[in-house]
Amino acid sequence: GDTGAAAIGAIKDRKNMKIFILHPQNKISEIQRKFMTTVDSSNVFNIALDGNFDECQKFVKSMFSDKDFSKAINMSGVNSINWVRIVIQIVYYFYSYFKVAKENEKINFSVPTGNFGDIYAGYMAKKMGLPINKLIIATNSNDILKRTINTGIYKPLKVQHTVSPSMDIQVASNFERLVFDVCSSDSNKTLKLMNDLNERGEFKLEKEELKKIKENFCSESLSEEETKLVIKEVYKNQKVLIDPHTAI
């Protein structure tokens, strides 16, 4: 929802661009819906799909996979499918580190995670040399990444709709980028795993691949009740009202 609103704000009324925004109907916040659906511009097209975020994303990815089609319309993406977004997100890991850490001190980052884009940017920052100890994948009840780290099996379940809708995702697109990396940049092996996911509904990582992930990541999830409790506690102690994603 936030990405869609920001993209519309950047592209509306541009003569040589059109933007098509997909969102799952009735599964984003009302303010996000209003931001995206009330812009009066001839080059903005908002499409509400009867489904969830994963289904919206699958539809967009299928268009990118059709090379002839995507090239013919000069198609680009504005969420973390686009590598540029990951590159930009890398910056604030460095900024945050230099604001809070001592020289060469290793710190942990806890990142509310849905599509694995933001936290993957942290992983890239670590690979660039930033002294990060662990990246904590913070999830809601859609805890596929936590389950994968614990078992090595990536198996999407039915999406649970929560008070943290930006994390209501079972197929985290950017996790494929991490899989490619821990598979020693073996594109054929990565493709096989992705085909397993599409055809069998799951794939399994080898022990060495899972070990590489655990060296850099850990994960925890919060229930709806736990999320609301954190919001109450922070407000009680700090007089700051945080949103559910921050609470997680």
Language-model-detected regions and their locations in the chain:
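PLP-dependent amino-acid enzyme catalytic core
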Residues: 2-248
